[in-house]
Amino acid sequence: MSFAEYLRQNGSDVLEALKIHVQLSSLSILIAVLIAIPTGIILTRHDRAAKAVLAVAGIIQTIPGLVMLGMGLMLFGLGSKPAVIVLVAYAILPIIQNTYTGIKEIDILYIEAARGIGMSQSQILFKVEIPLGLPAIVAGIRLSVVYIISWATLAALIGAGGLGDLIWTGLSSYDTNMILAGAIPASILSIIAGLVIDLIHRAVTPKPMRIKGDA
């Protein structure tokens, strides 16, 4: 059977797997963003804590995905819950790091100027630090999104479903069409997500000022 014929016969199953994969990845990224960005901001005010938190997050990143999923399975059982917990743990580090770095590397002159015109600390955060650090934050989110879409294929091993179901079932049954039906949409999804976030990154990145008379 050709791959095109396989898709004609099983297109609805592939679309359902894609839907689950998108939901699993989106939920994991959303939770990671809600945790990581505030944490990264808080860490910019506490350098000692930042070193410890980033070190722990870095250690988590070095643990193989299958090991983390196995731990999630033992602690939380089968299904999407352990998969989301593991994916969130993996997604957090790049966002925390980029949030922390993006804000810490802002030129102190901007902060001093904001204080000089009477801005409060919260005003400085929301009107100066976050806007200037946003390109770095978005870059961290992009990295996490691409990683999570790929790592979510492993979640099928603990019953979370998604495109990984097709890949792992295809591998176990030596069904090339099934493997491709899972791998190709996952790759395309990752590429599209990366391109969309690249556009967002360009939109939030400050443009250099043009001086009249410059070539």
Language model: regions and residue ranges:
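Short cytoplasmic-facing helical segments at TM-TM junctions of multi-pass membrane proteins
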Residues: 99-137
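Transmembrane alpha-helices
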Residues: 26, 89, 122-154, 186, ...
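Cytoplasmic-entry segments and transmembrane alpha-helices of multi-pass inner-membrane transporters
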Residues: 39-71, 87, 97-101
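Periplasmic/extracellular loop-to-transmembrane helix junction in inner-membrane transport proteins
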Residues: 1-28
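Generic alpha-helical transmembrane segments of integral inner-membrane proteins
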Residues: 26, 30-38, 42, 88, ...
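Glycine-rich helix-loop "coupling/hinge" segments at transmembrane-helix boundaries
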Residues: 73-74, 151-180, 184-185, 211-214
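C-terminal transmembrane helix and the adjacent membrane-cytosol boundary/short C-terminal tail
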Residues: 47, 104, 180-215
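Loop-to-helix entry region at the N-terminal start of transmembrane alpha-helices
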Residues: 17-24, 73-94, 134, 178, ...
